[in-house]
Amino acid sequence: MIHISIVILTYNSANYIKSCLDSVYLQRYQNFEVIVVDNGSKDDTVSLIKKNYPQVILIENKDNLGACKGRNQGIEVGRGEWIFTLDCDIILRNDFMGEIIKIIKSVPKMIGMLQPKIMKIDKIRVFSAGIYVSFLRRFHDVGKDEIDSAKFSKQMDIFGVCSAATVYKRDMLEAVRGENGYFDERFFFLFEDVDLSWRAQKKGIKALFCPDAACYHYGNSSCTPEKTRQYLCLRNRYFTLLKNDFIGSIILSFVFYDLPRLLYIFMANPRSLRAIKDIFDFKRS
């Protein structure tokens, strides 16, 4: 039987983790292990897990090491042939794991990333059907905020996957692993899934949207402040481009997409200026 390692991150997640884990353990397909990586929660997250889910493999970090480092820790511990990264504020449909197993058994060898249909918690609107990259290097969640419809009912090739809920082939992760880990730990969080998807694509590893495996996402359970998110988005966007893209495309993107909006961003959030220094430091490294 195919064995899957489910890697879940928590950070002050007591309000969400029980619903998430309950949905995991109610799955009909049970050949999996659950690894929870806690990033220094100050609430009851850890005690709740220890009391109610003794079967969970629990990694306790003293501080918030970020999504990238946390996921990498879980992947390294996991023994599965496939790795399922799962945000703690997601609830799986009861047939989720069974559908994933069907897909794993049927996909071609070059498929290394499976994107479930991530719905918003209202079960009406789509949160993500994968990641799309535009000519000007804007990155979008496919279908974000759209009402679920027939166009999200068929498998389709996609550029990348949303790591809030993605199933990765272990061999694929080993193939793209760099000196900064599977997920690049310099990112902390945001855009790390775009970067990983892009590195995989450059090695000929493909991503597939799998609508029959559905889950439901609350969103932003970490309550990241908007200005922090804005800073990380700007910084990590360019980390991603500098690692993976051609210089001509980066220049086009900067002139026609980023430049017009930078003045507003810097005026509204002076902290974002720090992103410029970080980007130059990243390039030098």
Model-derived features: where do they sit?
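Short, flexible, basic/aromatic active-site loop/helix in glycosyltransferases
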Residues: 134-158
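Short aromatic/hydrophobic "clamp" motif used to bind/position activated sugar donors
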Residues: 83
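Active-site-adjacent helix/loop segment of glycosyltransferases
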Residues: 207-285
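A conserved acidic beta->alpha catalytic loop
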Residues: 23, 38-47, 63
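A short, conserved alpha-helix in the catalytic core of glycosyltransferases
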Residues: 159-177, 181-214
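Conserved donor NDP-sugar-binding/catalytic core segment of glycosyltransferases
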Residues: 94-128, 132-133
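Glycine-rich, basic loop-to-helix element that forms the pyrophosphate-binding segment
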Residues: 61-78, 88
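N-proximal low-complexity "stem/linker" segments adjacent to membrane-targeting elements
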Residues: 1-26
